[in-house]
Regions:
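Short helix-capping/linker segments at secondary-structure and domain boundaries
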Residues: 38, 77-81, 127-137, 165-180
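Glycine-rich, often acidic, oxyanion-interacting loops/wings at catalytic, nucleic-acid
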Residues: 1-57, 182-185
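Short capping/connector residues at structural and topological boundaries
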Residues: 10, 14, 87, 99, ...
Length: 187
């Protein structure tokens, strides 16, 4: 679009009015300025993630990049306000609802009540991990394959996002590095 717009604006056969050409030129300039601001903010996020020890540990988790790590730390700090990883996941709205009657439990969809931005970041990260599952640690890859064999891909993605949030909580609260899940050997 950047290369085609000047040609379109100068093309006499299109019979564009002068005011329309001026408007399009102004919009192109605004787009260039917004793109430059986005690139600058991306550089700031990358720099912040490299300088922050918690961010460095978080980015070791599959599906968690600099944007997700910095957003999580900005929102929850060291996550010590949450007693368990499940509480953090619930705060983000990534835990399933539950309906039970007559001693039978039924899990429902996620609540979507928490931090929408963080929930979206973790779900998109989980989506990329599921798409690249063959490149993941053997334990995680095996778990994903088993889940995908039993249920819909979107359910697996949300389940993985929940798991990633819990991993992030553990990394932040325990001040440890991420350890990939190991496939248990059964005889």
């Amino acid at each position: 679009m950047d290369r085609q717009l000047p040609r379109i604006l100068e093309d006499a056969e299109l019979r564009l009015s002068g005011s329309f050409r001026v408007l399009m030129a102004q919009l192109k300039l605004e787009l260039e300025q917004v793109t430059a601001r986005i690139e600058e903010m991306d550089r700031v996020i990358q720099k912040t993630a490299k300088e922050n020890e918690d961010c460095q540990r978080l980015t070791e988790i599959p599906g968690v990049g600099p944007v997700t790590a910095t957003a999580l730390i900005a929102a929850v700090g060291n996550a010590s306000t949450f007693q368990k990883g499940r509480n953090l996941a619930a705060w983000m709205g990534i835990v399933p609802g539950e309906y039970s009657t007559g001693g039978k439990q039924k899990l429902l969809g996620i609540s979507k009540r928490g931090n929408k931005y963080l929930r979206t970041l973790f779900i998109q990260g989980a989506r990329s991990v599921v798409q690249q599952r063959h490149k993941q640690a053997q334990g995680l890859s095996h778990w994903l394959e088993q889940l995908l064999g039993r249920t819909h891909q979107n359910v697996v993605i949300v389940a993985l996002a929940n798991k990633l949030v819990r991993m992030a909580w553990a990394v932040l609260c325990k001040n440890e590095r991420y350890r990939a899940p190991v496939l248990a050997v059964t005889n």
